[in-house]
Structures are given as C-alpha cells and as structure tokens.
Amino acid sequence: PVNYREVDLYNKNNLNTLIHAISYAPISHLPENALVRLMNEDEPIGYIMRDEMMESRREIISLERLPSQQPGAGKPGISRVSSSISKSYRIIHNNRPIFLINEIIPENLFSERKTIRIQTPSRIHIGLLDMNGESGRVDGGAGITLDNPGFEIRISEADAFSVTSSDAKVSQNVESVIERLRANGLDIPPLHIHIDQAIPFHCGLGSGTQLALGLAAGISGFQGESYSDSYLIGLTGRGGTSGIGTKAFFQGGLIVDAGHRFGPGKSKSSFAPSSVSGGAGFAPLISRYEIPKEWNFVLAVPDGLHEIHGTDEVNIFQKCCPVPVHDVQVLSHILLMKLIPGIIEHDLDQFGTAINEFQEWGFKKCELDIQPPVIRTLIDSMRDAGASGVGMSSFGPVVYGVCDTGSSSVISAAEEVMNDYSGGKTILTKGRNQGAKIVS
C-alpha cells in the first residue's frame, strides 16, 4: 500500500499558489510514528521528516520547464497562468526510498511582475418585488450572497493583453466584458488575465455582474485607482433592474434593494432586465442583514436546460409585466413580516416559509411557470427531504434550498431528481457576509 497526498501551498498574503505537490510513500518503508502522523492530512510532510529525522538524502529524478499551454501544467491554481517548473525527486532513508514527490511551481514566482487576485461571491436572487409600477417605482427585491461558487481572477503585468481559462466560453465572456469596460472609458494597459474558477453562466447565480465588477475593480485596483462603487457599477452597466448582484459584490449579506423610479422621464420607463437597462443607474439599498453562519444552502444545477438570457429574457418581461398590484402587496408583506424577521431572529422555519411563499406570486411565479417540469419536481423533492425553504434563483435553472441540518438528505433528493432527467450537480455552500476580496 502507498500513502497518496496531493496539496496546494498558498501565499497567505495574496492567495497565489506557490507549489502544487503530489507525494507517494510506501507504507511498509515508514517508521510507525511517522506513519501515524502522515495519515493526518493537516500535517506537512516536511515537519514529519524533520521531527522524525527521516531524511538521509534526496535524489533528483527529473527537472523540466512546462510551457503555459501544455496539459501537464494544468494543476489547481497554476493552470496556464504562466510556464511552470516541474521537479520530481525521491527522499531516501536507511537506503530505502520513503517518499516520491512531484512538484510544480509557477515560473512567475521568480519574476518581479506585479500580480493581484480577485475573489468574488455569487448570489441567489429570491425575486423581484414590484413589477407593476403603480407605486412610481419598479423592480426592487431581495437576495442572498453566497460564498461558493465564485470567480477567482488573476491579473498580471504583461507585454501584451491576453486572457486564459480552462474554458473557452469563460475566456469569451471575459473578452466581452473587457470590450464593454473600454467602451465605457476604463483605460486597460497590457495585462494577462487568468480565470482560475468561474460561476456557471446563465444559471441564476449572477455570473455576469460578478465577472464584470471583478474585472473592473481588479483592473482599476491594479493601476492604483480607488473608484467609488457607483462609478464601477456605471463602467459595467450592471444593476439596471436588480441591485442584489452589485450589493453582493461590495457588501455581502442578505440584501433588500429599492428598485428604480418608474415612469416617463424617470430612471426606467419600461419593464426590462438588467442586461438592457444599463442607463437606469443602481438601485438604492433599503437594508442589509448578516446571514446566520449555521445556515446551509444547497444548490441544484440541472444540466441540459435552455438558458434564459438576452432576447428570451426581454420577451418574458414584456409578456409578464405589469403583474397584478395585489401580487406586489402580497410579496411586500411576505418580505417585511416573514423573510426579514426570520433572518434577524435566526428563525430558519419562518425564513424558509417566506422563501416558499415567494415562489407563488408576482414575477417569480411567471419565471417558474415557463420552466420545464424538472424545476418544480426539484423544488418539491428538496422540500420533502427537509429543506426549510426552496426556491428558484432568478430565471433559473438553479434551485436552492436552505437548511441547518439534514443537508445530505436534501442533496441526495436533488441528485436523484436530476439523474432522472438530464443530470446536473449539487453545491453545498454558506451565506457570505462580505463582498469580493482583492489581494496583491
């Protein structure tokens, strides 16, 4: 038998990967005390060898440079950012090999080129509040900031502008955002942008806003600029309908926003999604609340469903709006007297009840009515499995459930439903009470 271990070592100040290491240790060659410590995954091998005085010598097996596009360089936190150094060696003790170690080190660690890293949250959009407009305002709503998934973006000095990612679709989206930022006046010097991790696009988790703001804030911060939140939002053109994604990026927590002034000559004069409402300005914040740390969020992301964005999204707004004013009144009551008190008092049952009721009224009901049957089946199954509240985020297809215990049964129920259709994945995450993080 062989002990196998794979680890990433990070710089705690900027979260950049220093080393990706894989080790193999023949169990029969290890002293007993060293073996016990080795089975503790949190204890570094170097400490064990030092304390047990196990190392006699090292034998280098190979040392090579891996080009940035070579598949062998594709290790977590290292993939394609730059060329890498690959080193393999054996640790010898009592004339026997006790460790075989393979290390990959980003070559840019040996350069003096500036690099910063941006980590964004994602968000659940619970629902738009007022898609009637009689009040003189429109939009408004509530949403939850999530710790995972999120974008991890690295921006480095370069001789020419370039974008890399393990997913061509992600790179294309980055390039589209860069074009928009340039068109809106952001000066962008030669940079290398690499996406280490991405939020799935067009699934209801706010990927467009997080990517746009992550790039705008990262590039301006890279150049030493400190722009206001409103200026960065203006550069991206986001937040023209919902203010949840923009507030999630800057503040985190559970967000309630006030929407936009509505009518001739006002911020908005028609019902439309954020993607075509860039001139509406950002929605004022009504309130923000801390998300209880003990609450879990289960995300079910079905595969193979039609993505609703662009023209499809615009058409749905035109078809469904204005919604009856009675629906707006009911949703306002649910928000004010159930959802907000539930989070203030950490009352998961009341909060979950509000989430469940939100699905049956106003624009959210319209969003759900156009979904394939798997979405309603997911919602029902996750509730039956014990989630206190289950809903669809934005236009979906992501379905989310909130619970404190019993997450595993909710995950199993969601996976069973998705496997009966076209498949999908689940994500277990927490609420996030801070916004994006930028480190250099």
Language model features by range: what are they?
Residues E112-S207, S220-S230, G234, G240, ...:
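ATP-binding N-lobe of GHMP and related small-molecule kinases
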Residues P121, F250, M392-P397:
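Short Gly/Ser/Thr- and Asp/Glu-enriched loop/turn motifs at secondary-structure junctions
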Residues R113-Q119, G127, G133-R137, S228-S388, ...:
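ATP-dependent small-molecule kinase catalytic core of the GHMP/sugar-kinase superfamily
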Residues T209-Q223, G396-C403:
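Short, small-residue alpha-helix embedded
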Residues P1-E112:
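Composition-driven recognition of glycine/serine/threonine/acidic- and proline-rich low-complexity segments
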Residues N11, S23-I27, I155-E157, S165, ...:
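Short beta-strand-to-loop capping motifs
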Residues K12-N14, N94-N95, I155-A160, F250-G252, ...:
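Short acidic-glycine loop/turn motifs at beta-strand connectors
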Residues P372-I375, S393-G401:
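Small/polar glycine-rich anion-binding or flexible loop at a beta-alpha turn
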